[in-house]
């Protein structure tokens, strides 16, 4: 068994070479790789934090936009409702003005009809009085004085006018 494991100078040189190689690799390879990995991990963590921040900001902006949109919709509804109320009010004013104008026109027409009626009655009374005078002169052969004659005609006209216009 002595031949299988021997502790001669080669063994110690190999052990020393391995140790030196380990220290050289540690200094030139493992340490830069570890630093690179740490930097990369830190960069990834910063990217994740930045992405979360951006996500949070975008959610806040989304909430603000939704709030503004809701406010705009509410304002739009108020404007439409106000426009409808104004239109309804204006329509009512137009209808009211038309009603007033129609009543005024009816009153004017009624007054005009009343004037025409009065005018026709006066003309008719004049014609009736002339007819009554002519009839009275033919019927009454006797001679009446002018005032009695006029009084009789006026009574006839009044009775004829009342009877005629009451119907």
UniProtKB/Swiss-Prot annotation:
Keyword Membrane assigned: yes
InterPro entries, A to Z: ATP_synth_B-like_membr_sf, ATP_synth_b/b'su_bac/chlpt, ATP_synth_F0_bsu_bac, ATP_synthase_B_chain
UniProt topology in membrane: Single-pass membrane protein
Localization: Cell membrane
Keyword Ion transport part of the UniProt annotation: yes
Keywords per UniProt: ATP synthesis, Cell membrane, CF(0), Hydrogen ion transport, Ion transport, Membrane, Transmembrane, Transmembrane helix, Transport
Gene Ontology CC: plasma membrane; proton-transporting ATP synthase complex
Residue intervals passing through the bilayer: 10-30
Gene3D superfamilies: F1F0 ATP synthase subunit B, membrane domain (1.20.5.620)
Main location: membrane
GO molecular function terms attached to this record: proton-transporting ATP synthase activity, rotational mechanism; proton-transporting ATPase activity, rotational mechanism
Family from the record: Belongs to the ATPase B chain family.
Function according to Swiss-Prot or TrEMBL: F(1)F(0) ATP synthase produces ATP from ADP in the presence of a proton or sodium gradient. F-type ATPases consist of two structural domains, F(1) containing the extramembraneous catalytic core and F(0) containing the membrane proton channel, linked together by a central stalk and a peripheral stalk. During catalysis, ATP synthesis in the catalytic domain of F(1) is coupled via a rotary mechanism of the central stalk subunits to proton translocation. Component of the F(0) channel, it forms part of the peripheral stalk, linking F(1) to F(0).
NCBIfam families: ATP_synt_b
The protein's assembly and partners: F-type ATPases have 2 components, F(1) - the catalytic core - and F(0) - the membrane proton channel. F(1) has five subunits: alpha(3), beta(3), gamma(1), delta(1), epsilon(1). F(0) has three main subunits: a(1), b(2) and c(10-14). The alpha and beta chains form an alternating ring which encloses part of the gamma chain. F(1) is attached to F(0) by a central stalk formed by the gamma and epsilon chains, while a peripheral stalk is formed by the delta and b chains.
Protein name: ATP synthase subunit b
The gene coding this protein: atpF
């Amino acid at each position: 068994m002595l031949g299988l494991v021997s502790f001669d100078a080669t063994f110690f040189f190999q052990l020393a070479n391995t140790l030196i190689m380990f220290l050289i690799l540690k200094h030139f390879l493992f340490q830069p790789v570890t630093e690179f990995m740490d930097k990369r991990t830190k960069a990834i963590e910063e990217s994740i934090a930045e992405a979360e921040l951006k996500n949070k900001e975008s959610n806040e902006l989304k909430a603000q936009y939704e709030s503004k949109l809701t406010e705009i919709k509410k304002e739009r509804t108020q404007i439409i409702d106000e426009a409808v109320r104004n239109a309804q009010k204006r329509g009512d004013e137009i209808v009211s003005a038309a009603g007033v104008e129609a009543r005024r026109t009816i009153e004017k027409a009624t007054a005009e009809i009343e004037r025409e009626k009065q005018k026709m009655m006066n003309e008719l009374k004049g014609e009736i009085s002339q007819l009554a005078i002519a009839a009275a002169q033919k019927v009454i052969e006797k001679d009446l004085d002018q005032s009695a004659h006029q009084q009789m005609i006026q009574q006839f006209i009044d009775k004829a006018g009342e009877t005629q216009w009451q119907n």
